[in-house]
A protein has these predicted regions:
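Secretory targeting signals
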Residues: 1-27, 50-115
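Short helix-to-coil transition segments within interhelical loops
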Residues: 37-46
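Amphipathic alpha-helical segments used for helix-helix packing
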Residues: 36-38, 66-67
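A cytosolic-side transmembrane-helix exit/cap motif
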Residues: 27-34, 100-106, 130-139
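Terminal transmembrane helical anchor/hairpin motif
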Residues: 108-170
Length: 170
């Protein structure tokens, strides 16, 4: 595959891994009985969520590197690091949105639906190519949008962690 088709494969298929790795990070603590136990611990819940988030990012990077390495091994030609980082950022944006919605709504299903809806809006063309929320910009050679996606997804995670900490205080 050439650069354009490789970007299409990575951006339209592989980024879905982010949904499955990040959305369920808060699901174990969504029960009221479990929340009572968690909020009495000495370690803050937001620290546990941050650790889970970092671990899921590391696993995401390893999985995308492995998949991209197999693509190179099977004679696909593309800039490895640029495409891996772009794919990781898009997957992180999808997963971060789902994680944030899951935390804010206290429902894992809502997180999955938000991430799937965001992906479908991008796939159907409802999000324009020039938008800072466009997931598939690598195939068009626009990497600047990926920086906006990275900032947006990190901001959502930080706001969600602050929300978890404030919710504990209430």
């Amino acid at each position: 595959m050439d650069k354009v088709h490789s970007a299409e494969c990575l951006e339209q298929s592989v980024i879905l891994i982010g949904i499955f790795l990040m959305v369920p990070l808060n699901v174990p603590e969504q029960s009221k009985a479990i929340q009572e136990v968690i909020y009495t611990r000495s370690i803050s819940h937001w620290k546990i969520l941050l650790l889970r988030f970092v671990m899921s990012i590391l696993i995401l990077i390893m999985m995308i590197c492995l998949f991209s390495g197999i693509m190179i091994w099977k004679n696909c030609t593309f800039p490895f690091m640029a495409y891996v980082m772009g794919t990781v950022i898009s997957a992180m944006a999808l997963g971060s949105l789902g994680l944030a919605v899951s935390i804010w709504s206290n429902s894992g299903v809502a997180g999955y639906l938000a991430s799937a809806g965001y992906f479908l809006l991008n796939s159907m063309g409802s999000v324009s190519d020039g938008s800072i929320f466009y997931l598939f910009s690598m195939g068009k050679g626009n990497y600047m949008i990926k920086l906006y996606l990275l900032g947006w997804s990190l901001l959502m995670v930080v706001i969600s962690l602050i929300y978890v900490e404030k919710k504990r205080d209430c």
